[in-house]
Amino acid sequence: MSELKVDTGRLSHIANSGPMSILAYCASSILMTVTNKCVVGSDKFNMLFVMLFAQSLVCVTALVLLKALGYVQYRPLNKVDVKNWLLISVLLVLMTYTSSRALKYLAVPIYTIFKNLTIILIAYGEVLFFGGRVTAMELSSFLLIVLSSVVATLGDQQALAKKPLAAAVESILGLNVGYFWMFTNCICSALFVLIMRKRIALTKFKDFDTMFYNNILSLPLLMLASFMFEDWGAANIARNLTKDYIIIMIISGLASVGISYCSGWCVRVTSSTTYSMVGALNKLPIALSGLLFFDAPKNFLSIFSIFLGFLSGIVYAVAKQKKQSQPAN
């Protein structure tokens, strides 16, 4: 069984506070995005698999410590569950790797906006594989998502037009590579979510079971990929595994633990409706953090695309809640 310990002591007013859970969830999301961008956005860093390995290792270590302290419970490793969950871990590695590659080339606001395209793939995947349906309001949110992506692209082009020719050509090549990795990530993310839904029904996993198995099974896959595809020469290791990079990777890993923990916390002390709305609203501060901390395009189209992406998230969250409240046919 996987469960989260609820504090009933002196700090119970914090542990049961809706606003605190929402702030913690938003802060964790922003922290993870910003720290990841700090690492992958550097021209010096080229060991993404090592970064992902470090993040998964931090997650596993944190879960083991939390379990030892009695704050969480999760299912121990066993052959049957490992066999059933291995494909999910492979998809997780592909999803996180392509996400990191996209984040390397794209500005945080653009990355956040294009990430919404995954919602469309998942929705129609559920129609194909689970007999779901898409409501008119959901379709409206999808149109807003596509529109926000188009406007974001136009904003990028407007920013490029102001650069010298050589710099503009280099930036265009980088953006095209980023778009490729972003669309690949959307496909991997949709497959991950859709197949994981089936496997959760098979294994009866709870939240912390999923988190533990996702990360611990990813460790050997990530290390193998690193040894196969990355440069483990002394000079490259010295350039990549500096004290600053290691600290940022640890912080990012802890932030991912925080996101998972705060997700369950938020649902427990508020409601699934509030949580879904927070997920939609959280797109705005993440995108704005990219404008604040990094050299992202700052023109009308770029800002407007963030607003459209934010609006599409709200419309989609409301549409999902309305659909869930309707009686099944």
UniProtKB/Swiss-Prot annotation:
Self-association and partners: Homooligomer.
SUPFAM superfamilies named in the record: Multidrug resistance efflux transporter EmrE
Alphabetized Pfam families for the sequence: UAA (PF08449)
Membrane topology: Multi-pass membrane protein
Protein's UniProt name: GDP-mannose transporter
Transmembrane segments: 14-34, 45-65, 80-100, 110-130, 134-154, 175-195, 215-235, 246-266, 274-294, 299-319
Statement: the UniProt record of this protein carries the keyword Endoplasmic reticulum: yes
Source organism per UniProt: Eremothecium gossypii (strain ATCC 10895 / CBS 109.51 / FGSC 9923 / NRRL Y-1056) (Yeast)
